[in-house]
Amino acid sequence: MIKGDIRKQQILDTAERLFTSRGFEATSVQDILDEMRLSKGSFYHHYATKEDLLRKICENRAERTAPKTDEQEASPQNGLQRMNGYLHEMIPFHGEGMVFLKMICPVFSNAVGKSVREGYADALKKAWAPYIEQALAEMIREGSGYTQYPEMTSSIAMDLVNDLWQQLGDEIIGSSHALDPQISASLLLEKIEPYRCALENLMCAPYGSLELLKLQDILNAIDTVHEWKS
């Protein structure tokens, strides 16, 4: 890695740490410069705005959610089980995705947030495409799914999943009142049902074979947002 690339990554790492610990809105470019003892010229040589930093951080996080090749090969799951697991892991309501959700909470619904969300969704789709396509191919071979257009079907499936988590995020973050978390989670699970049915129909998968999100995933997302709001 050349010197300029190293500096660029160091800025990203520092910004991510500060955004996570202090919050995106509470962290200024000057805070990042002070932390690194860096000049403004050096910063702006790599990034135009703080928003550009957030966008790149989130895209990197999306790329890291995809499974490692050795993990995939070691898994004893069949195609349908893989598909269920992959679609679940794409949704940023657990693991690496929770850090993304926490960082983007303050700007989730404004122009910056929507741009970051689009970048994250695009990066997710690019990172997960080969795995979703492979799982679908396994489903077809095993008889648990069918389509004449596997590549297009995989693309549409990922678009549905990306739309789902953004819709749920809008519901959770945009809520002006704090319901009991269990009640909120139950209501949100109902909103998942049309997406689940659409995905099963798209792949000709058995009814009820895809789960997408568990109740605990929704509760974790609600807790993260409530923590930010409080």
What positions do the PLM features span?
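Short secondary-structure transition hinges
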Residues: 95-134, 141-155, 181-182
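C-terminal peripheral helix-coil segments that are non-catalytic and often amphipathic
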Residues: 126, 130-137, 141, 166-230
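Generic hydrophobic, amphipathic alpha-helix propensity
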Residues: 7-15, 32, 57-61, 65, ...
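Helix-turn-helix
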Residues: 10, 18-52, 56
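Hydrophobic/aromatic residues within well-ordered alpha-helical segments
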Residues: 50, 61, 65, 90, ...
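Hydrophobic alpha-helical connector segments
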Residues: 56, 70-100, 150-157, 192
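Short coil/turn segments at alpha/beta junctions that flank glycine-rich nucleotide-binding fingerprints
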Residues: 21-25, 76, 142
